[in-house]
């Protein structure tokens, strides 16, 4: 199969994997309602500088994903499909970019195609590329920067590579506008480890090898600096401190106690059995098999460092989530594909002595094609049937439909101490901002003002008098209560 045919096949498979049935289910879990709500609020307010949630600045990360989601809402309407488009395109571009760059590295079309296919069909990569959020964009930015860096510094060393360095800058720009300091640290730690290995191996320090990525990184940070300047214009130093220190350094060091997701240092070690499913075994066996070749094979060394250095960085961070491993997926796919290629050569060498090996060699195309189609069919089935079924437990639509029904009746519905997911879901589905109350005194005053006033609240236990429950809706493991003042029923 030619490289062109493979690339077209990958394009078709990736479009199927990332876009088919993308909008057949509602916003689910915690991240999707929150990010979609921020995007809807940006669309409604027309404030494209400061991301807001429930009319409050929300600066956990820079706003690239929210910009794209808000633009999609403006173009296609406020639907789950629209706000998932950015992640889906990020997944698609990551797969196609990996294939193209591996071919530029001189790898056979078969190896490049298998690596790209394994990336597209890693369970965590696939699922996160179909969800609202910034993680797919972060993975695209990090992989773009690292692949371009390796091409410019190793493959085309001592040759003009301005295009590759500009691609490197684009990757850094995407990753930093998606995740801030982490988007700079993840490719940065790999590049640092690579340059140290290069210096040790050649027993000399080449200053230009260090200065070149630094200069193009400065170029890449210009879009982030422009946004920070505009943010400063709207909110001053407090907003800059929140995005640069509290939500970046604070989350890494653990000093920001409200960030959450705190896990022990061994958290990611316990997640290794599921990190790169279904290709885990090939990844880890490949790392072991290639360990003695690393210093002689710069290509294998680079992708091993992509895994190890980023894994170490994430392990040292206080805030940990399984989704953060998504940026390691391209390197894992490359190592898995390279080891699969080694296994294929071993089977071919034994074909003369083993009937089973000979059968596999004779029918390898049919076997591989069938296996790939079965994997794709499995993911398509999950997208078509499993995700919509989860709506019964995870969708906020029944809750927001109830809010709308009360509003149609002339009731004034307000939120009491809403969680991020509740605030996001309410603004996304209602395409409007509900009033919010923070203190219990505000709640009492609101309910006493009119018998038509209804408060929506989340509670682990049923609210007690003087509150009266008029309805409740369960979303996942959380229960949301619609309450009025009990005194209204005393008459």
Regions found by a protein language model. Give the residues of each.
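Membrane-integral, polyisoprenol-dependent glycosyltransferases
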Residues: 1-349, 353, 385-389, 424-427, ...
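N-terminal secretory/membrane-targeting helices
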Residues: 15, 119, 169, 179, ...
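Short secondary-structure transition/capping segments
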Residues: 97, 352-357, 367-368, 456-466
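Alpha-helix N-cap/loop-to-helix boundary motif
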Residues: 300, 328, 332, 365-370, ...
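Extended hydrophobic-aromatic, low-complexity segments
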Residues: 322-325, 336-337, 345, 368, ...
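Signature aromatic-anchored transmembrane alpha helix within multi-pass, membrane-resident enzymes
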Residues: 341-382
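Short periplasmic/luminal acceptor-recognition loop of GT-C membrane glycosyltransferases, typified by
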Residues: 375-486
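Short, solvent-exposed mixed-charge patches
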Residues: 489-491
């Amino acid at each position: 199969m030619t490289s062109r045919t493979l690339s077209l096949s990958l394009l078709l498979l990736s479009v199927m994997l990332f876009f088919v049935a993308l909008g057949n289910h509602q916003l689910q879990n915690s991240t999707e309602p929150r990010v979609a709500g921020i995007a809807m609020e940006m669309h409604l307010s027309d404030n494209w500088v400061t991301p807001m949630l429930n009319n409050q600045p929300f600066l956990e990360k820079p706003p690239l994903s929210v910009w794209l989601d808000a633009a999609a809402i403006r173009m296609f309407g406020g639907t789950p499909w629209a706000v998932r488009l950015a992640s889906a395109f990020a997944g698609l571009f990551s797969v196609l970019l990996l294939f193209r760059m591996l071919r530029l590295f001189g790898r056979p079309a078969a190896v490049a195609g298998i690596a790209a296919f394994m990336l597209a069909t890693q369970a965590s990569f696939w699922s996160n590329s179909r969800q609202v959020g910034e993680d797919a964009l972060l993975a695209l930015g990090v992989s773009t920067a690292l692949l371009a860096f390796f091409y410019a510094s190793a493959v085309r060393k001592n040759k003009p590579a301005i295009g590759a360095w500009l691609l490197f800058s684009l990757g850094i720009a995407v990753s930093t506008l998606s995740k801030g300091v982490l988007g700079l640290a993840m490719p940065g730690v790999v590049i640092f480890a690579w340059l140290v290995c290069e210096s040790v191996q050649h027993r000399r320090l080449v200053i230009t090898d260090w200065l070149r990525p630094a200069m193009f990184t400065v170029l890449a940070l210009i879009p982030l600096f422009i946004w920070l300047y505009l943010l400063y214009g709207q909110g001053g130093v407090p907003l800059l401190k929140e995005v640069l220190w509290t939500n970046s350094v604070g989350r890494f060091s653990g000093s920001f106690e409200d960030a959450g997701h705190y896990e022990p240092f061994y958290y990611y070690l316990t997640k290794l059995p599921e990190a790169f499913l279904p290709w885990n075994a090939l990844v880890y066996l490949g790392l072991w098999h290639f360990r003695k070749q690393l210093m002689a094979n710069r290509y294998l060394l680079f992708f091993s460092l992509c895994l190890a250095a980023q894994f170490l960085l994430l392990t040292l961070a206080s805030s940990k989530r399984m989704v953060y491993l998504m940026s390691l997926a391209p390197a894992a796919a490359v190592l898995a594909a390279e080891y699969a290629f080694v296994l294929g050569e071993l089977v071919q060498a034994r074909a003369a002595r083993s009937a089973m090996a000979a059968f596999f060699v004779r029918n390898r195309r049919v076997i591989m094609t069938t296996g790939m189609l079965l994997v794709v069919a499995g993911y398509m089935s999950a997208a078509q049937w499993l995700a919509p079924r989860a709506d019964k437990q995870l969708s906020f639509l029944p809750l927001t439909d109830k809010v709308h029904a009360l509003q149609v009746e002339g009731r004034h519905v307000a939120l009491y101490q809403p969680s991020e997911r509740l605030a996001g879901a309410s603004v996304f589905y209602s395409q409007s901002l509900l009033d919010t109350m923070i203190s219990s005194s505000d709640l009492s005053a609101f309910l006493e003002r009119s018998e038509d006033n209804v408060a929506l609240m989340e509670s682990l236990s049923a609210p007690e008098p003087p509150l009266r429950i008029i309805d409740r809706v369960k979303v996942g493991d959380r229960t949301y209560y619609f309450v009025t003042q009990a005194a209204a029923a005393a008459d």
